[in-house]
Amino acid sequence: MPWILCSIALSLCSCFFAQSWSMLAPFPGVERDDAVGFILGEDIYVGSGLSPWWASQGDFYRMNGSNGQWESVAPMPPGMERQYASAFVIQNQAFVFGGYNAGVFLNDLWRYDPVLNLWSACNNLPSNGRSGAASFVLNGKAYIVGGKQANSAASDEVWSYDPQSDAWTPQAPFPGGNVWRSSATSQHHLGYLLFGRNENNAFLNAFYSYDPLVDQWTALPSFPAPGRSHAGLFSLNNDLYSCFGMDSLNQSLNDLWKFDSLNASWIPC
């Protein structure tokens, strides 16, 4: 869950620009990894994932952005527990897609309404279930990239989802090959994808942008260090940042990098 922790810290810590960190209230639920997180308004939501006793979770908690306090919110419906899902937000509604539970790779999509504190089912992805897919949002649509499928192979598929029509559309495949556990975000009119693993478990350091207007991917300067997975990628004040992750030696990383778009280069923070 490194990218969730990174997002929480940077969302609430005004001293980030001095390159310092602040400790926040600990997560009140059971310890877990492979969870999802998203931000609605000023509040941060964290849920799903895998517990220390290898049980998929469906509970969710909200951190109040004003006072930093946690409280439980509606869990996903019974039987919908999962790990390695992907989450995104469109028009103050959160969505949780896919993942893995009890040997099954999932292709379902769930919508969370924070006003009603209610989960509702959306149309399933019209393709194989997958875990560890990446997602970003552009122009009111979500884009789901890659993921690991039941045959243990990663995927290069890209799908867009329109919540207005509750419909899925295939897009140009990811040119970096089959990938899962990548990091993704959007900034202005482009989506971005960094890191991940392929079906041979090779760790990747490639970096791409995606333009939805022409349905086209463009290679950007690769990350200047060995590849990783489980990392964070986010946009803040017109800049892109990447943090944390896991490398090929199974080591957890704590570094923070900035992508300088003007000079097309990576800078350690």
Region spans (language model):
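N-terminal signal peptide c-region/cleavage motif recognized by signal peptidases
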Residues: 13-14
